[in-house]
Amino acid sequence: MDWMNIFLAVETSDSAGSGSLELKWLPVAIVCFLMLCLLVFLLIRRKKQINQKNAGQPLNVIRQIRVGKLHGQGARNYQQDSFGVSDPEMLEGSGLLAVVADGMGGLSDGDKISTTVVETVLDGFSYSQGQGTLEQVLLTLAQWSVREVNFFLGPDRYRSSGSTMAMGMIRDGHFSWVSIGDSRICLYRGGQLIQLNREHDLKQKLALQAINGEIPLQEVYTDKRRDGLISFMGMGTIDQIDMPSTPLTLLPGDQLIIMSDGVYNALEESEICAALDKGVEAAPAELEQAILNKAYPDQDNYTAVILSCET
């Protein structure tokens, strides 16, 4: 036998086997490559979907609202302030609503009227699930509250009792409000306290009379009736309300405070700012201690709800 022929035969056989082995693994390699391409495609598409979802949204989105609460009787015999905050679980879908009502101490049943206002607002918000624009929701709740208070009093008792109402609603990074009376709604931003709503007291009417020359300008500041309310829950037909033309766009770090006059009449603006600067968890105690330190013998009921906007 020719050894050269045997060698060539073996080499030929090995080469044929190697080629067969390579062909066997080729489909597996192709499948793996296609799967890798599919994975890359899915990752790229997912990234595009996330970018499209976030397109047009601000980088600092308000995702959490923390709430602080202050409620004290002061030197009064009764607590006639009422307040409430909606269920935080409703924030993502419906928004968050807060309300403060200050029963009028000079009239009877102020506590019952303020309680009626708060209960109607919160029950109505829960029932409606906050459907509609901010303005529509707030006006509807105000309408229901006026109706319930008037029904409670009856036509013969209009103006015999009353309460203020200040409510605000946050949804999707925006804030709007409706107020009746002299409870205040303020924004604390960048170390400054900005009053958002207008008070409905006799001072406004006196100022109008003064600029029309009907009374001396000095009477705007000296008339003892100047703090009396000219629009309030319980008067029957409401004369005035306050609401913004457009909702306020909120920023991370903003704080909103809704408070009765027992807070802002007792404290200087700088004292309120100093308390809010401590943060929403510490602010209520800081405000209360500042009020107690004044030791006013006629200290009114004091109530505040603080809403802190966070990412």
Regions found by a protein language model. Give the residues of each.
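PP2C/PPM-type serine/threonine phosphatase catalytic domain
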Residues: 2-311
